[in-house]
């Protein structure tokens, strides 16, 4: 009898494949929309923290109404600095406003997909989006991928660039460092290829380290066989 594939083990949901969210700092969401719809909420940065579950640092902010929230830290923010959230907040790094109030050409991040959802887009370390144009019923923003996306003018965004942009500049150099990067998020690492396994472990294993049969497989194949090009219309180079 063959062994379970990696995706079969992952689907079982054991702790080997489960995210260690108990080690994460917590959810990063904007304050509820009803608190800042008409007035500006001001808060002070209490501390800047490393979050194992993110590529960007997070800042803990204490607001004037006593509420504490985690925000994604922008480049250049300092402990003790004040930030503001609301439609009348000044145009300043770290402040959060509706896209309708942000000038064209501004760098923004942590953009809401729909008004009040707390922030969905552009949250990774070192990234930013560009406000390209504003119209009455939509705001066009260029995402880090280069895609031009339309947003509701009432969707909120934070001005600035996400901190942690230099994390990819230093080379990993050795496997030990890659191991700890994966371990922080409980990633399954290293992940061996099927052709390097024994035949008992994988349909592509055994023989002379090549698949030895077509790599295409039916959409209705059983879980232990469903590897390779699943229900592929075509394979190989386009000629």
UniProtKB/Swiss-Prot annotation:
* Gene Ontology CC annotation, any one: cytosolic large ribosomal subunit
Biological process (GO) annotations held by this record are: cytoplasmic translation
Q: Do you know which Pfam families this protein is assigned to?
A: Ribosomal_L2, Ribosomal_L2_C
Q: Which Gene3D superfamilies match?
A: 2.30.30.30, Nucleic acid-binding proteins, Ribosomal protein L2, domain 3
Q: GO: which molecular function terms?
A: rRNA binding; structural constituent of ribosome
Spell out the residue ranges making up region: Disordered.
Answer: 200-239
Question: Do the record's keywords include Transcription?
Answer: no
> Which UniProt keywords are given for this protein, alphabetically ordered?
Ribonucleoprotein, Ribosomal protein, RNA-binding, rRNA-binding
Protein origin, superkingdom: Archaea
InterPro entries (UniProt xref): NA-bd_OB-fold, Rib_uL2_dom2, Ribosomal_uL2, Ribosomal_uL2_arc_euk, Ribosomal_uL2_C, Ribosomal_uL2_dom3, Ribosomal_uL2_RNA-bd_dom, Translation_prot_SH3-like_sf
SMART domains according to UniProt: Ribosomal_L2, Ribosomal_L2_C
Where are stretches of biased composition, namely Basic residues?
Answer: 222-239
Tell me, in a sentence or two, what this protein's role is.
One of the primary rRNA binding proteins. Required for association of the 30S and 50S subunits to form the 70S ribosome, for tRNA binding and peptide bond formation. It has been suggested to have peptidyltransferase activity; this is somewhat controversial. Makes several contacts with the 16S rRNA in the 70S ribosome.
Q: Which family does it belong to?
A: Belongs to the universal ribosomal protein uL2 family.
HAMAP family in the record = Ribosomal_uL2_A
- Alphabetized PANTHER family for the sequence: LARGE RIBOSOMAL SUBUNIT PROTEIN UL2, RIBOSOMAL PROTEIN L2
Q: How is this protein organized at the quaternary level?
A: Part of the 50S ribosomal subunit. Forms a bridge to the 30S subunit in the 70S ribosome.
**Name of the protein this chain belongs to:** Large ribosomal subunit protein uL2
Species for this entry: Thermococcus onnurineus (strain NA1)
């Amino acid at each position: 009898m063959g062994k379970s594939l990696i995706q079969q083990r992952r689907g079982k949901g054991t702790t080997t494949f489960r995210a260690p969210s108990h080690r994460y700092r917590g959810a990063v969401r904007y304050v509820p929309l009803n608190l800042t719809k008409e007035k500006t909420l001001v808060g002070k940065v209490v501390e800047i923290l490393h979050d194992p579950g993110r590529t960007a640092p997070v800042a803990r902010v204490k607001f004037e109404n006593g509420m504490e929230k985690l925000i994604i830290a922008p480049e250049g923010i300092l402990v003790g600095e004040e930030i503001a959230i609301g439609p009348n907040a000044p145009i300043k790094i770290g402040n959060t406003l509706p896209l309708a109030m942000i000038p064209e050409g501004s760098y923004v991040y942590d953009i809401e997909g729909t008004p009040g959802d707390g922030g969905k887009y552009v949250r990774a370390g070192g990234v930013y989006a560009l406000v390209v144009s504003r119209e009455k019923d939509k705001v066009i923003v260029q995402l880090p991928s280069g895609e031009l996306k339309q947003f509701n003018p009432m969707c909120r965004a934070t001005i600035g660039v996400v901190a942690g942009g230099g994390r990819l500049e230093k080379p990993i150099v050795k496997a030990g460092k890659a191991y700890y990067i994966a371990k922080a998020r409980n990633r399954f690492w290293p992940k061996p290829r099927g052709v390097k396994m024994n035949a008992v472990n994988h349909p592509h294993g055994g023989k002379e380290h090549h698949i030895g049969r077509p790599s295409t497989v039916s959409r209705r194949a059983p879980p232990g066989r469903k590897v390779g090009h699943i229900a592929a219309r075509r394979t190989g180079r386009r000629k």
